């Protein structure tokens, strides 16, 4: 089974997240994309105290109508920081026959060398770096951390960097949606409409539960 992994704080999940998942699913013929909300993200401090369970519920609402999308709460079942390598190891134990495609924004990939055990991530799965506004990668090989660059070989015909482990790094350009969770939170706090930025069930849930208002 070819399985995509899309992690994030999802605070809240929005249409750009969903479109990225769909573009990668389509481009790489994935059987499923698993959305994995981060319980305690090491790279992005959480703004506000939005509980993990609430963010998971928003992801469930956003993905409920797509049989190719699934949601996992495995990071909420662990203590400590939500390191991606720990999540990958757990998924490989749970689903030993799957081939995983780790989906990451180009902005995060450019900082990949600062990630916990990033070398092990390259040896654990395929990686799909997805273009994000303001973070275009023009030379994928140059974006690889210098310390591990000799472990890769570029395959021009397939536009991928093959790692010595057998996995590859790909770059997917041209996903134009520029939507930010922080802008959605700001609109919600001001009582303004967030319609068409998030799926309708998520917008309703945010409004009904007063998730981003101070008097929640």
Curated annotation (Swiss-Prot):
Pfam families: CTP_transf_like. Its EC number is 2.7.7.18. It catalyses: nicotinate beta-D-ribonucleotide + ATP + H(+) = deamido-NAD(+) + diphosphate. Pathway: Cofactor biosynthesis; NAD(+) biosynthesis; deamido-NAD(+) from nicotinate D-ribonucleotide: step 1/1. One of its GO terms (biological process) is NAD biosynthetic process. InterPro entries: Cyt_trans-like, NadD/NMNAT, Rossmann-like_a/b/a_fold. Gene3D superfamilies: HUPs. It is an enzyme of class 2 (transferase). HAMAP family: NaMN_adenylyltr. Catalyzes the reversible adenylation of nicotinate mononucleotide (NaMN) to nicotinic acid adenine dinucleotide (NaAD). This is Probable nicotinate-nucleotide adenylyltransferase. It comes from Geobacter metallireducens (strain ATCC 53774 / DSM 7210 / GS-15).
